[in-house]
């Protein structure tokens, strides 16, 4: 027998790791066209700044490179803050807050011009859209942690939990309604306004110190740190009312279904499972795991969220069904089982194991996804080239 003649094909699960998308999904991805609707309050004046900034970006720099640089800066500056404030109750050196403000501002700026650079270099593609949203999903987690540290929200664990997960929920809902309607909608108060508000919070902590947020407001008898929290609550109500108005009024698919022809409520199972697991593990912890390690806890669930959000984005782009079964839930599942068996293993140890599993699972999926799409569309992820995929049609309807 000739060498290799009897070789068996790789198991299905091994192939899925390297090629998450099927041939049919890749064909539908080629047909995807990005469509955005609406304009936020700060967008018109900031367009002048973004246009000015774009002229300093060399034409050879790929849009995805710009996005990744911004994300890396945002992550590194937030990790410095986490190092000084692991329980979100400490006061960090003033320069760490300033560093976070600068990091978030740079991230926002680069995130805003990556699409402009893509159109400028005629390199718009589904890969760029996926890469941008994937980075945004991870940045959402770090922004929530950084802002919570800036106001020392760890002194109020329940509010800290709420603010740590509400950003994930709102980000998911924004893409949930996109999966239903086929259109990404920007509200009058959207991510740009939130980022500007967070930069202001970091600057206030820089010059006033994190302890300034412990000041009790006369008459109202609430601490100053609760004011931005109430702003988050108001933003949640305002944004989600718009998101669910779109979701519950039916999608563009057959009989009011999603763009993939599935139930408009089906994506809610994924974010619902994440939040339910997070709440159950938080409240049932015998060692007060969330109170002692809020940053690690949020980052672990943040990795789970980031992968699920990426799957929702690619499901929209490929008009595919979103399946609940996923290896990324292994991490939270280990924590749940450990509690079920009366903490057979130290919760802190299991939390670290869950963090490693969830982060690697998320990174492997996102890397495999980008590599598969780049091969199929004959694109270089971090370089502009003469041979590009067919340009997307960008529609921005006011």
UniProtKB/Swiss-Prot annotation:
It holds the Pfam family CDP-OH_P_transf. The modification N-acetylalanine is found at residue 2. One of its GO terms (cellular component) is Golgi membrane. Keywords: Acetylation, Golgi apparatus, Lipid biosynthesis, Lipid metabolism, Magnesium, Manganese, Membrane, Metal-binding, Phospholipid biosynthesis, Phospholipid metabolism, Transferase, Transmembrane, Transmembrane helix. Its cofactor is Mg(2+); Mn(2+). GO terms for molecular function: diacylglycerol cholinephosphotransferase activity; metal ion binding; phosphotransferase activity, for other substituted phosphate groups. Residues 2-62, 119-125, 180-190, 249-265, 317-329, 377-398 are cytoplasmic. The record marks 129 as: Increases basicity of active site His. CDP-choline binds at residues 64, 119. The active site is at residue 133. Its EC number is 2.7.8.2. Belongs to the CDP-alcohol phosphatidyltransferase class-I family. Catalyzes the final step of de novo phosphatidylcholine (PC) synthesis, i.e. the transfer of choline phosphate from CDP-choline to the free hydroxyl of a diacylglycerol (DAG), producing a PC. It thereby plays a central role in the formation and maintenance of vesicular membranes. This is Cholinephosphotransferase 1. It comes from Mus musculus. The gene is Chpt1.
